[in-house]
């Protein structure tokens, strides 16, 4: 594949580095210790097709990457009350790139205690950590 004739102001690596500097990573081992903790919310930001295909961390809240900022903002008509002050949030995606970027944005929005799962869900599964199935919406029949 040939390289395009232009340069971006910031490339993906720069964006990831900037986001990582604003947030904290958490290992799969340390994250597993937080499972079931009332003050910690696991947030799966993967596409719904990934959840259907690969499962998810048991008890995680699914917030699609494209809606996350809207669901976090209490001034948005899309706000979800799972996002409240005083809780820790562990964001994850497949490999940790989207989660790192998302965690950086949430930190910019003023949220604290935001973590991204190092290595993402792939690392979580590879280490033999618990995996559950995506809960189906009560409004849609199972296929």
Regions found by a protein language model. Give the residues of each.
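Active-site flanking residues adjacent to catalytic metal/cofactor-binding acidic residues
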Residues: 43
